[in-house]
Amino acid sequence: MVSGRFYLSCLLLGSLGSMCILFTIYWMQYWRGGFAWNGSIYMFNWHPVLMVAGMVVFYGGASLVYRLPQSWVGPKLPWKLLHAALHLMAFVLTVVGLVAVFTFHNHGRTANLYSLHSWLGITTVFLFACQWFLGFAVFLLPWASMWLRSLLKPIHVFFGAAILSLSIASVISGINEKLFFSLKNTTRPYHSLPSEAVFANSTGMLVVAFGLLVLYILLASSWKRPEPGILTDRQPLLHDGE
């Protein structure tokens, strides 16, 4: 039986995820001038919002689908589809976030992919894309044998947690980079901790807290989905009745 601590953790996780997105929106709206889709700096402001929403919050939530007790009984297929759909939604938000930053850079003739933040971020997105397509092909389509799925499942689980960790690192480095670029004049330098810096740093801490809670729920052995019985060697997952 799953204890009330699990549901309390889920409630806390939902609150933290909502705060991560809302804090990022407020930062971009209040201190950075709001949003647009015209190649200006206001178009860039979509980038942090969409990356936090996609690569952290939606991705983290999608990773926990199989921790829900409701997914432990009855057909497994609906939960597989939900898991894949939430990750796909996270990926779409991420791609739109990348379009926003690349369009802004190209419009202002700023170099792309030169900073450590950008290298880390684009690597994370590449791994996410590989993870999603591999998971879809192996764990959802009916062609893969049980042997192949058993071989790849630990790798899939490892990269799921690794990608979330890399996403958090990308967000934190991105917040820092944005503050260094924006708060560099003599009236409000970053090192003097103006209100924007305090708020943005707090947003980063919320992202870290969200990520750590996701990892805690993922790693808690008592909250993992019980292993099903032995399946036939080539039972297609699109037709399973687990």
UniProtKB/Swiss-Prot annotation:
EC number(s) reported in the record: 7.2.1.3
GO molecular function: metal ion binding; oxidoreductase activity; transmembrane ascorbate ferrireductase activity
Its membrane topology: Multi-pass membrane protein
Positions bound to heme b 2: 67, 83, 156, 224
Gene3D superfamilies linked: 1.20.120.1770
Transmembrane intervals: 8-28, 46-66, 84-104, 120-140, 155-175, 203-223
Cofactor notes: Binds 2 heme b groups non-covalently.
Gene Ontology biological-process annotations: intracellular iron ion homeostasis
Subunit field text: Homodimer.
Its job: Transmembrane reductase that uses ascorbate as an electron donor in the cytoplasm and transfers electrons across membranes to reduce iron cations Fe(3+) into Fe(2+) in the lumen of the late endosome and lysosome. Reduced iron can then be extruded from the late endosome and lysosome to the cytoplasm by divalent metal-specific transporters. It is therefore most probably involved in endosomal and lysosomal cellular iron homeostasis.
Name the UniProt record assigns to this protein: Lysosomal membrane ascorbate-dependent ferrireductase CYB561A3
Organism: Homo sapiens
Organism taxonomic ancestry: Eukaryota, Metazoa, Chordata, Craniata, Vertebrata
